[in-house]
């Protein structure tokens, strides 16, 4: 109550911020008359003037009013579009590193030119991030005309682009590209063997379009670059025969072999199920008679069984994936788009391929990986824009430190959002949707029907065909024609069925879009200018008639056939209507069979329906029902937020390690001289080897001299007469012997340098170091994956899984660094380098075969949210000998802490 009173008196923080920005807009507007008086050359010359002032120490904030006024005038001259005051406010919000929530159709693309131009003046590069290649290309071409007019360069960064073109795109002042491509380029840059092969500059300023989709929806799906491992794929086909022979439990009390937890997307075998699976596998010859699935030797078999169960019970054709040209292609659950070239990890994709009877591709080994959360947090300054961010404002603030500012609309929003109608069955709901579509079509009102899956999309399309209603279908299968279909969805009486957010980023113009026809007439060289103008005028008059007819019919009507887990996605669907003050309406038709209602609210609503004795085909419609559904969505949103937060906390561990490895790698690439590093590593490794045979401070009688001689010869090709040295010099103590061994190793290495030359040996050292670093890092990523999958089970032992993960991940990392040190020392001391050709042979690094850019599984993170999962995880790496804590004394006996001795690389 006090809070609402405070808001009434002082206004909300959002209102106060917008008021402050509007004061700055007045200053920008005051400059407009002066800008209009400038010639094109004078206006374009402002860019050089701004850059000179920045060099003299003027801040971007000081330049903002003038720079924004320049961009507004340039856009008016080049595109015929003038930035509204609210777009100026949005531009300032983005420049300040915040998120601008701006309604659909309010001109986010044009708004982004303001902060992009201003920040590009600093010369560090600006990245505009979009959700697909089509939007990146469209926006770069469209807005690039404004930047080009003002003397700035624009690049577009697309997938499968040649290396030289990518470098040119990143060298431009402003680069447009997709979130995936920026992330993959970062990972690829950290896999190169020469500095000149890199494409990205340091990450300075990023503007993310559809920021909610990228930083929230896709935050659980890491970007993974992987190569194929040598694994037997026949096992997937054999294990695929197991799930059809098992019985699913209907509920917790009923009998069955396995249960499916839809909330956490897990499949769990019952006791009876375990026994039955063991019987089937024994019968197939995959399990030894009397063997158990829990035997250490059968861990991978267990992994295959669960992958097959998930493929059969949780992933369905035309909903989670489609089969195209003999391949299983993932459907993005948030956008409904096909994700060609992406594969689920952990053997799930192969299990789905086995289920569908298509060729099984080998399982992948992770070469590099990063989450969008950690990638985008590396930008010096980050901002975003979307039509729907307010519901997730807390998450943006807590995870990314980004404040959300709601920008007022240019014109008042008059769309009418009706209450949800809930039906008992999906059949009744579909009939109600068809009746509503028919009514809209007959009165000439365009209608957009949103579905949550391709399966529902095609099913509804078949029903509409049966009812004789003409319509356009838009889902991932029609990806190529997406923008065209959406652009014409505003024609009088048009019926369009689209999956979730297909066509996002393209406006639905009431009366249909005529831009394509206008461009065709303008570009027709056979027509005289007068004829062109006459045709365009006639075209516009015809469009105006259609536009007025649609307005009279009530504008665009939105029908939702199912509530999404997130209110934001529902708001995005609604937001397609009522753009820029246009009329419109929306309604959701639901059934008790929908996943959200079935899991969270069906019993309560069904009880109300029974109590009211509602006949078949009758819907329940009440603000209470709408509120109950929104509460269910809030619960799911909160749970998903908790999962993302948990995942981030786990991923931060590997992210810290990634930073160390990539920093080390970049230093190696940039440095010419790494001889000192190699020498320090050699001394460390030889020191450890000596310690194993001659313990520090031990008596002469305890020394294993013969064993040390043998080890030095075998591992480092150092044939040293240690016994002879000791016999000849009775005063030679442990320290003296150590010095002689290290001196002999240095002398042997100097001989190698004399043979091949200092420059050749440095190149050899660098190549060995890079390859060893990469190989061990890949193995480490795989070990971390295995550790992470089973870590939640530590909760049963009254241990904190997160703390255990941090501790073991550090131990793995320390072991990896020690292994790199040992391997590099062994290779550099044992490999015979006699000529420059030998160096070149080492430098010819083998490129990973069949590299793929992978999309991680949907169920990732469910383990952290629900420790009830009894799924056995693959065994983690085996540790030999006692584990050493980070702050414990180093076992080598140096007296230093482990982290300051053998716990670091060099």
From Swiss-Prot:
Listed cofactors: Zn(2+)
Q: Which GO terms describe its biological process?
A: intracellular protein transmembrane transport; protein import; protein targeting; protein transport by the Sec complex
Q: Is the keyword Nucleotide-binding in the record?
A: yes
UniProt: ATP binding residues = 87, 105-109, 507
* GO CC terms in record: cell envelope Sec protein transport complex; cytosol; plasma membrane
Q: What is its main location?
A: membrane
Q: How does it sit in the membrane?
A: Peripheral membrane protein
**Coiled-coil region:** none
Binding, Zn(2+): 890, 892, 901-902
Q: What is its EC number?
A: 7.4.2.8
The transmembrane residues are: none
Segment forming the signal sequence: none
Q: Which GO terms describe its molecular function?
A: ATP binding; metal ion binding; protein-exporting ATPase activity
Which reaction(s) does the protein catalyse, per the Swiss-Prot or TrEMBL entry?
Answer: ATP + H2O + cellular proteinSide 1 = ADP + phosphate + cellular proteinSide 2
Compartments annotated for it: namely: Cell inner membrane; Cytoplasm
Task: Report the top EC class in one word.
Answer: translocase
* Annotated cofactor note: May bind 1 zinc ion per subunit.
Look up keyword Transport and say if it applies. Answer: yes
Which Gene3D superfamilies does the entry link to?
A: Helical scaffold and wing domains of SecA, P-loop containing nucleotide triphosphate hydrolases, SecA, preprotein cross-linking domain
What keywords tag this UniProt record? Answer: ATP-binding, Cell inner membrane, Cell membrane, Cytoplasm, Membrane, Metal-binding, Nucleotide-binding, Protein transport, Translocase, Translocation, Transport, Zinc
Which family does the record assign? Belongs to the SecA family.
Q: Which HAMAP family match?
A: SecA (MF_01382)
Summarizing the function annotation, the protein's role is: Part of the Sec protein translocase complex. Interacts with the SecYEG preprotein conducting channel. Has a central role in coupling the hydrolysis of ATP to the transfer of proteins into and across the cell membrane, serving both as a receptor for the preprotein-SecB complex and as an ATP-driven molecular motor driving the stepwise translocation of polypeptide chains across the membrane.
How the protein assembles, per its UniProt entry? Answer: Monomer and homodimer. Part of the essential Sec protein translocation apparatus which comprises SecA, SecYEG and auxiliary proteins SecDF-YajC and YidC.
By what name is this protein known? Answer: Protein translocase subunit SecA
What species does this protein belong to? Thiobacillus denitrificans (strain ATCC 25259 / T1)
Please name the gene that encodes this protein. secA
């Amino acid at each position: 109550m006090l809070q609402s009173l405070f808001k009434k008196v002082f206004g909300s923080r959002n209102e106060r911020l917008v008021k402050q920005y509007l004061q700055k807009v007045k200053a920008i507007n005051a400059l407009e008359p002066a800008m209009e008086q400038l010639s094109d050359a004078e206006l374009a010359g402002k860019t050089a003037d701004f850059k000179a002032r920045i060099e003299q120490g003027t801040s971007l904030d000081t330049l903002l009013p003038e720079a924004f006024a320049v961009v507004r005038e340039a856009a008016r001259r080049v595109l015929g579009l003038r930035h509204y005051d609210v777009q100026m406010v949005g531009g300032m919000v983005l420049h300040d590193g915040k998120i601008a929530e701006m309604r659909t159709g309010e001109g986010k693309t044009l708004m982004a030119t303001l902060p992009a131009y201003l920040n590009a003046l600093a010369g560090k590069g600006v990245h505009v991030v979009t959700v697909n290649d089509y939007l990146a290309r469209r926006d770069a071409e469209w807005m690039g005309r404004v930047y080009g007019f003002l003397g700035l360069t624009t690049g577009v960064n697309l997938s499968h682009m040649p290396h030289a073109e990518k470098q040119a795109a990143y060298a431009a002042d402003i680069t447009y590209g997709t979130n995936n491509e920026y992330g993959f380029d970062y990972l690829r840059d950290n896999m190169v063997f020469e500095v000149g092969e890199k494409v990205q500059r340091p990450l300075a300023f990023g503007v993310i379009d559809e920021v909610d989709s990228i930083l929230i929806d896709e935050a659980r799906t890491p970007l993974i670059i992987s190569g194929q491992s040598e694994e037997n794929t026949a096992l997937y086909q054999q294990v695929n025969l197991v799930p059809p022979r098992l019985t699913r439990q209907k509920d917790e009390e009923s009998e069955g072999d396995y249960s499916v937890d839809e909330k956490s997307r897990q499949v769990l075998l019952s006791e009876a199920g375990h026994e039955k699976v063991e019987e089937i596998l024994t019968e197939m010859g995959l399990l030894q008679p009397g063997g158990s699935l829990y035997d250490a030797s059968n861990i991978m078999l267990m992994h295959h069984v669960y992958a097959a169960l998930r493929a059969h019970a949780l992933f369905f054709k035309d909903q989670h994936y489609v089969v195209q040209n003999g391949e299983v292609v993932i459907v993005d659950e948030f956008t409904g788009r096909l994700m060609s070239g992406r594969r689920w990890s952990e053997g799930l994709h192969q299990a789905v391929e086995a289920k569908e009877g298509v060729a099984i591709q080998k399982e992948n080994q992770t070469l590099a990986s990063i989450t969008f959360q950690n990638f985008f947090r590396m930008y010096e300054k980050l901002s975003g824009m979307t039509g729907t961010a307010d519901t997730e404002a807390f998450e943006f603030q807590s995870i990314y430190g980004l404040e959300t500012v709601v920008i007022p609309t240019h014109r008042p929003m008059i769309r009418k959002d009706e209450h949800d109608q809930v039906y008992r069955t999906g059949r009744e709901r579909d009939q109600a949707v068809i009746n509503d579509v028919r009514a809209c079509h007959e009165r000439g009102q365009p209608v957009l029907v949103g579905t949550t899956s391709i399966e529902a999309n095609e099913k509804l399309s078949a029903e509409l065909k049966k009812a004789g209603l003409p319509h356009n279908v838009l889902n991932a299968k029609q990806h190529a024609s997406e923008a065209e279909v959406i652009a014409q969805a505003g024609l009088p009486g048009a019926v369009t069925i689209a999956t979730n957010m297909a066509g996002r980023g393209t406006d639905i113009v009431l009366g249909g879009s005529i831009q394509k026809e206008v461009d065709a007439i303008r570009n027709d060289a056979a027509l005289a200018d007068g004829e062109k103008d006459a045709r365009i005028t006639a075209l516009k008059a015809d469009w105006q008639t259609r536009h007025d007819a649609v307005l009279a019919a009530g504008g665009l009507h939105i029908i939702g056939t199912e509530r999404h887990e997130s209110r934001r996605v529902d708001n995005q669907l609604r937001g397609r209507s009522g753009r820029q003050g246009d009329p419109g309406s929306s309604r959701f038709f639901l059934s008790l069979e929908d996943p959200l209602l079935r899991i969270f609210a069906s019993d309560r609503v069904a009880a109300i329906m029974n109590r009211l004795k509602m006949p078949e085909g009758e819907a329940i419609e009440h603000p209470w029902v709408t509120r109950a559904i929104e509460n269910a969505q809030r619960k799911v949103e909160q749970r998903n937020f908790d999962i993302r937060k948990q995942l981030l906390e786990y991923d931060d561990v590997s992210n810290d390690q990634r930073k160390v490895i990539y920093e080390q790698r970049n230093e190696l690439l940039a440095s010419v001289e790494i001889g000192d590093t190699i020498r320090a590593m050699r001394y460390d490794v030889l020191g450890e080897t000596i310690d194993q045979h001659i313990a520090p401070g031990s008596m002469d009688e305890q020394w294993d001299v013969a064993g040390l001689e043998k080890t030095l010869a075998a591992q480092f090709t150092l044939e040293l007469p240690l016994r002879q040295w000791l016999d000849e010099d009775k005063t030679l103590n442990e320290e003296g012997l150590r010095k002689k061994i290290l001196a002999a190793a240095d002398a042997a290495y100097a001989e190698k340098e004399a043979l091949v030359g200092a420059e050749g040996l440095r190149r050899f050292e660098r190549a060995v170091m890079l390859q060893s670093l990469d190989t061990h890092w890949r193995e480490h990523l795989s070990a971390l994956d295995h550790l992470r999958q089973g870590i939640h089970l530590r909760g049963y032992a009254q241990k904190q899984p997160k703390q255990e993960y941090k501790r073991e991940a550090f131990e793995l990392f320390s072991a990896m660094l020690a292994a790199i040190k040992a391997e590099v020392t062994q290779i550099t001391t044992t490999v015979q380098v006699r000529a420059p050709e030998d160096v070149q042979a080492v430098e010819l690094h083998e490129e990973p075969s069949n590299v793929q850019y992978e999309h991680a599984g949907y169920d990732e993170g469910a383990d952290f949210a629900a420790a009830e999962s009894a799924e056995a995880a693959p065994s983690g790496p085996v540790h030999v000998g006692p584990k050493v804590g980070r702050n414990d004394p180093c076992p080598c006996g140096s007296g230093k802490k482990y982290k300051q001795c053998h716990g670091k690389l060099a």
